[in-house]
Amino acid sequence: MIGLVGKKVGMTRIFTEDGVSIPVTVIEIENNRVTQVKDLEKDGYRAIQVTTGSKKANRVLKPEAGHFAKAGVEAGRLLREFRLNEGEEYTVGQSISVEIFADVKKVDVTGTSKGKGFAGTVKRWNFRTQDATHGNSLSHRVPGSIGQNQTPGRVFKGKKMAGQLGNEQVTVQSLEVVRVDAERNLLLVKGAVPGATGSDLIVKPAVKA
């Protein structure tokens, strides 16, 4: 089953009949419009390309304008692609709504996490701090040793060090679908999802469900 592109609206909570409070993230999923269908013969794999939302006319590049015009759909703010399974068929110009999640119990949500700028190892990787006293006057939050000696004579790739924190693609798996509001194009999922309010999200049926 394909996924859809949505937008993070924010968090709230809803109550069950027993009075239990459930924290939910509200995701607005406007109708996704199919701009291209890829097939095995021409592209080597089966997939659909979709767009959503809108874009100011003066912001649409000429190649984009031609691509959207060929599909007969309004120019959207982005393009995303979803692989098709056997038996799934879509046509160019078709509109796909949030209702495809009506029978889905859990979803995976992918977004871009909030950027935190340059961060040290304590904040970025949860390193322990060194002694506050006992002779330590300069190295309270430094990482310590980052390698060995002449052998191997280098720092191993992947070593956890200070650097950019956040602003990277993050996927949260198996979030429970609490409610699907087709009238308002809303999907409510239990828990938090990556990204700032207003950021784009990709919602897919959970692979581990």
Curated annotation (Swiss-Prot):
It comes from Proteus mirabilis (strain HI4320). Methylated by PrmB. Belongs to the universal ribosomal protein uL3 family. The keyword Ribonucleoprotein applies. Part of the 50S ribosomal subunit. Forms a cluster with proteins L14 and L19. The modification N5-methylglutamine is found at residue 150. GO terms for cellular component: cytosolic large ribosomal subunit. This is Large ribosomal subunit protein uL3. It holds the Pfam family Ribosomal_L3. One of the primary rRNA binding proteins, it binds directly near the 3'-end of the 23S rRNA, where it nucleates assembly of the 50S subunit. Signal peptide: none annotated. One of its GO terms (biological process) is translation. GO terms for molecular function: rRNA binding; structural constituent of ribosome.
